[in-house]
Amino acid sequence: MLSLTMLLLERVGLIIILAYVLMNIPYFKNLMNRRRTWKARCQLCIIFSLFALMSNLTGIVIDHQHSLSGSVYFRLDDDVSLANTRVLTIGVAGLVGGPFVGLFVGVISGIFRVYMGGADAQVYLISSIFIGIIAGYFGLQAQRRKRYPSIAKSAMIGIVMEMIQMLSILTFSHDKAYAVDLISLIALPMIIVNSVGTAIFMSIIISTLKQEEQMKAVQTHDVLQLMNQTLPYFKEGLNRESAQQIAMIIKNLMKVSAVAITSKNEILSHVGAGSDHHIPTNEILTSLSKDVLKSGKLKEVHTKEEIGCSHPNCPLRAAIVIPLEMHGSIVGTLKMYFTNPNDLTFVERQLAEGLANIFSSQIELGEAETQSKLLKDAEIKSLQAQVSPHFFFNSINTISALVRINSEKARELLLELSYFFRANLQGSKQHTITLDKELSQVRAYLSLEQARYPGRFNININVEDKYRDVLVPPFLIQILVENAIKHAFTNRKQGNDIDVSVIKETATHVRIIVQDNGQGISKDKMHLLGETSVESESGTGSALENLNLRLKGLFGKSAALQFESTSSGTTFWCVLPYERQEEE
C-alpha cells in the first residue's frame, strides 16, 4: 500500500507541475477568468481532457498478485487493473468548468480507459461520468457566486469522488471477490493522494488568480494617483513646464530610474538617471523614440544598444516608450527608463499600456479645454456641457475606495469614467449625436453615481430601437437626469425613480421625456428655470439654461425645454425633429 501511495504521489506531482506552469501563462489565466463563456468551456474541455488522458496513460498496473508496475500503457491485459489520477483531473475539470466540462472530460477519459482494456474496464466509464457530473454541480454552485470552491471543500469533494469510484467498482464489477480485494489495496492510497492533489491543484488556481487580482488592485491604485496628480498639468497642454511636473510625479510614484517626455521634435523634460545629457530643449537623442514616433506603437527594449543613445556614459539599460496621441495623431512620447534591465517586468508593461490611453485622453481633454476658450464666435459650441470637476474627483474618490474592496468593480468603473470623458470630448465638438450614444453616456454617468450612492436611485430607460438613431444635442438626457439626481430628492435615501422615455409626437417629431417622483420645484423658481441661472444650495441651474439655449439654437423655439411639476414629481420634455443619422 505504501509503494502504491508513493507511485501515485509521483503521478500527482507531474499533474501539479503542469498545473503550475499553465497558471503562469497569461492566456490560461485569462481563460480561467472567462470560464463561464462557451468558448472558454470548449477550450477547458480540451485542456482537461489532455490531463485525463495523461492520467490514464501514466497509471500503475496492478495484477491479481498485487504486483505494481509503472510505465506508459496504451493497452492492458484483461486480468489487470489500473490505479491512476484520472479522478483528480475529472474532478478539477468539473470544479473549474461546471457540469458541461466535467461531463465532457469524464466521457473522454472513460472511453479512453475502456479502449485501454483491463479487468472490468467499463466500470471506469460509468464512474467517470458520475464523477464529472457531481464535480460539475459543485463547480456550478461556485460559479454562481463568482468564486472557486475553497481548498478545504475541494479536498472533501476529492474524497467523495474517490468514494464514488470505489462504490462503482464494487457495484458494477463482474468478479465481486476481486473487486473487494482491489478496493482493499487501492482505496486508501487513491483517496488520500487524489483528494490532496485536487486541493493543491485548486489552490494553485485560486492563489494565482488572487495574486493577479491583488496586482491589478495595486496597479489601479497607482494609476488613479497618477491621474489625480497629472490631470492639472495635462490640461495645460504638452509644454516644457507641464512636462517637467508630469515627469517628476511619474518618477516619484513608479519604480523607474528616469522619466522623459518628448514632443515630436524635442525633449520636453527628463528627470532621473541620464539627465546630464538628455537635456530639455535638445533634439531627440535616441533612435528608440524616433521609431515610436514613426510607428505609433509602444516599444520595450532591454539593452543600451536598443535604446540607441549615442552618449558613451549613458547609464540607461532598458526602456519602455509610449506614444502620446491626440485625435489619432502622434504628438509625443512618454519614456520610462531603467538602469537595471531586470526592473522592467510584465507589470511595468501592463501599467504603461494603460497609462498610454489615459494620458492621451488627458491631453485631448486639455486641448479641448484650450480650444473652447478660443471659439468666441461659436455660440452653440460655447454652450456645450463640460465635465464637472466635482463629479470627476468624486468619481475618482469612489473608485479609490473600491480598489481595495472590489478591484474588478473598480476596474469597471474606471472604464466607465474613461468612456464618460471620451464622450464629453466628442460631444464638445459636435452639434448632434445619436440617441443611442447619448444613452450610453447616460449609463456611464449612472454607473458612477450609483457606485457613490448604491440603491438610492432607480433609473428606467424605455426607448424603442427605432428611435436610437434619432439625432439629439449632446448631453440632453444626461443633464436632465443629473438635474433630477441633484435636486429632486433632497435627502431621501430610497424610492427615488427616474424614467427616461421617447414617444412619437407627430409623423415628423418625437418627444423626449425625463420624469422623476421627487419633491417638485418651488413655485417661485418655476418661471425662471431654463431661462436664466437659478441659485440653490446645490447649483445655479445654468446647465438647464445652456441646454435650453442649445435646443432653441439648433431646432428653433418649438424645441424649447418644457416641464410640469407638482409635489409628487417633475416631468421635463422637449419635442425634436425626427432626424436620423444617415447610413455611411
UniProtKB/Swiss-Prot annotation:
It catalyses: ATP + protein L-histidine = ADP + protein N-phospho-L-histidine. Keywords: ATP-binding, Cell membrane, Hydrolase, Kinase, Membrane, Nucleotide-binding, Phosphoprotein, Transferase, Transmembrane, Transmembrane helix, Two-component regulatory system. PANTHER family: SENSOR HISTIDINE KINASE YPDA. The gene is lytS. GO terms for cellular component: plasma membrane. The chain crosses the membrane at residues 2-22, 42-62, 92-112, 121-141, 154-174, 186-206. Its main location: membrane. It is found in: Cell membrane. GO terms for molecular function: ATP binding; hydrolase activity; phosphorelay sensor kinase activity. Autophosphorylated on His-390. One of its GO terms (biological process) is cell wall organization. It is a multi-pass membrane protein. Its EC number is 2.7.13.3, 3.1.3.-. Residues 379-461 form the Histidine kinase domain. Member of the two-component regulatory system LytR/LytS that regulates genes involved in autolysis, programmed cell death, biofilm formation and cell wall metabolism. Also participates in sensing and responding to host defense cationic antimicrobial peptides (HDPs). Functions as a sensor protein kinase which is autophosphorylated at a histidine residue and transfers its phosphate group to the conserved aspartic acid residue in the regulatory domain of LytR. In turn, LytR binds to the upstream promoter regions of target genes including lrgA and lrgB, to positively regulate their expression. Residues 311-363 form the GAF domain. The modification Phosphohistidine is found at residue 390. This is Sensor histidine kinase/phosphatase LytS. It comes from Staphylococcus aureus (strain bovine RF122 / ET3-1). It comes from the Bacteria.
